[in-house]
């Protein structure tokens, strides 16, 4: 059995494992809220270390924090930022809605590590007290949401955005490479007029670019921090100027444009900026779902489907059917998209859970956003690396579909009229003819007219056929 030590808080003594850096309040949370397997996101450990370091710097600069205590706190925060002590943050997501227990977990770990560095006993709170020093000028009610915003912003800008940009660039490169491949378009899952494969993929690239722009716009609100609002947004126990100073310090430490929120009541009673950010993740997920499904559909086959695209073989596709290749990267990405959409529903409900001066669904919100960002990042990277970059067109099959398509008749409509063009398409279908054969049999155009007007390469951009020679008998309506 592990040795224990006594730690104290306002409720009395608590037994804590002797080798752990956390204190009484963390231990109480472990005993009362060990629910499920979801731990607080690792990103929150890092963001809180940044926040506590910035607060110590601001309090020291403001003359409120002793120099030796300041150095101990900063040193410990730097250790955490370097990846040390992460096993000292064991709390589960499903705790108090304010995140107070996690804030105290951070305060206690920093305090006890400072005690170790100073050569004093764990739990002595000397020379660094978890509340008086580490939590100086703060409340859980403003520090936890600020840590949420820092974690979300860093995770999005440092991980998700580069991953989406790389996927966008890979798709855009394919679009440019395939701009000369004319293929048949499809609407309602039925044949439509032609476009190029490059144009089709340019749409995918544009969707991702738009998604990145939406995320960038949403981040503007996430950069506004609650820190300095303390308990209810008034700033009680925070010195004048602390809010602005600590936000500037966080901006310096992260390289991101964090500022003090102009109205602390709004960002402590609600977290609309994170709800908006989650909405942009949901929109991105919807785009990825469409892109993955399109590629999955166009690659279906190889002999009884569209088979317009050849996708890489990641692994054997079946335990019973030899030689089968499945679009597993597309399937994985669509599952990720569904999970992100579900997470957004939770974030939306959580964001609405602001009662009076404080939102009480904070851990739920950051848990779901952190998961969404992580799986979107990894999903985009895998989809690019193991599918997009290795995908190739089946030019023979694409050409065959274009030549067989009845919807090329659309180019004839401005010349012979919609009704006659429709008759050609139906006649070709009913008699198993090519479009050209049907048009000539009905006598609506001559062969030279058909060849000039019905040119798939012309139809991939704005194009209206002109009448340059007398039309065949019966071509004009009336």
UniProtKB/Swiss-Prot annotation:
There are 2 substrate-binding sites: the catalytic A site, and the non-catalytic B site that may play a role in the transfer of substrate or product between the active site and the solvent. Alternatively, the B site may bind allosteric effectors. GO terms for biological process: fumarate metabolic process; malate metabolic process; tricarboxylic acid cycle. Substrate binds at residues 98-100, 129-132, 139-141, 187, 319, 324-326. It is an enzyme of class 4 (lyase). GO terms for molecular function: fumarate hydratase activity. Its main location: cytoplasm. The record marks 331 as: Important for catalytic activity. It holds the Pfam family Lyase_1. The gene is fumC1. This is Fumarate hydratase class II 1. InterPro entries: Fum_hydII, Fumarase/histidase_N, Fumarase_C_C, Fumarate_lyase_CS, Fumarate_lyase_fam, Fumarate_lyase_N, L-Aspartase-like. Keywords: Cytoplasm, Lyase, Tricarboxylic acid cycle. Involved in the TCA cycle. Catalyzes the stereospecific interconversion of fumarate to L-malate. One of its GO terms (cellular component) is cytoplasm. CDD domains: Fumarase_classII. Homotetramer. The keyword RNA-binding does not apply. It comes from Bradyrhizobium diazoefficiens (strain JCM 10833 / BCRC 13528 / IAM 13628 / NBRC 14792 / USDA 110).
């Amino acid at each position: 059995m592990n040795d224990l030590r006594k730690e104290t808080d306002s409720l009395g003594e608590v037994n804590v494992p002797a080798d752990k850096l956390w204190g009484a309040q963390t231990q109480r949370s472990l005993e009362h809220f060990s629910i499920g397997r979801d731990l607080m996101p690792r990103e929150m450990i890092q963001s809180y270390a940044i926040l506590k370091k910035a607060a110590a710097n601001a309090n020291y600069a403001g003359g409120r924090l002793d120099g030796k205590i300041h150095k101990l706190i900063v040193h410990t925060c730097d250790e955490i930022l370097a990846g040390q002590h992460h096993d000292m943050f064991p709390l589960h997501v499903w705790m108090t809605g304010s995140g107070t227990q996690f804030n105290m977990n951070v305060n206690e770990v920093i305090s006890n590590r400072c005690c170790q560095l100073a050569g004093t006993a764990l739990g002595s709170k000397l020379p660094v007290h978890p509340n008086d020093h580490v939590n100086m000028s703060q409340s859980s009610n403003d520090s936890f949401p600020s840590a949420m915003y820092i974690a979300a912003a860093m995770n999005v800008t440092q991980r998700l955005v580069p991953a989406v940009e790389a996927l966008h660039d890979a798709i855009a490169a394919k679009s440019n490479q395939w701009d000369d491949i004319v293929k048949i378009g499809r609407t309602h899952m039925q044949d439509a007029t032609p476009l190029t494969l490059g144009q089709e993929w340019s749409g995918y690239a544009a969707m991702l670019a738009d998604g990145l722009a939406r995320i960038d716009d949403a981040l503007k609100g996430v950069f506004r921090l609650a820190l300095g609002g303390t308990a209810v947004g008034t700033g009680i126990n925070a010195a004048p100027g602390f809010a602005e100073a600590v936000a500037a310090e966080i901006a310096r430490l992260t390289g991101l444009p964090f500022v003090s929120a102009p109205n602390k009541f709004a960002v402590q009673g609600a977290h609309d900026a994170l709800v908006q950010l989650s909405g942009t993740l949901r929109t991105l997920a919807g785009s990825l779902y469409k892109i993955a499904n399109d590629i999955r559909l166009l690659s279906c086959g190889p002999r009884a489907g569209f088979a317009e695209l050849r996708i890489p073989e990641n692994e054997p596709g079946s335990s019973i059917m030899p030689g089968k290749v499945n679009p597993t990267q597309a399937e994985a990405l669509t599952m990720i998209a569904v999970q992100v959409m579900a997470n957004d529903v939770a974030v939306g409900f959580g964001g609405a859970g602001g009662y009076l001066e404080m939102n009480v669904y904070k851990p739920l919100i950051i848990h779901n956003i952190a998961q969404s960002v992580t799986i979107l990042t990894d999903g985009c990277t895998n989809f690019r690396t193991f599918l997009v970059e290795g995908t190739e067109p089946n030019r023979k099959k694409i050409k065959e579909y274009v030549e067989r398509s009845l919807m090329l008749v659309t180019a004839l409509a401005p010349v012979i009229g919609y009704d006659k063009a429709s008759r050609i398409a139906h006649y070709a279908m009913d008699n198993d003819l090519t479009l050209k054969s049907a048009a000539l049999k009905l006598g609506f155009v001559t062969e030279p007219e058909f060849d000039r007007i019905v040119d798939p390469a012309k139809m991939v951009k704005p194009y209206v056929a002109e009448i340059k020679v007398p039309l065949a008998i019966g071509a004009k309506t009336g």
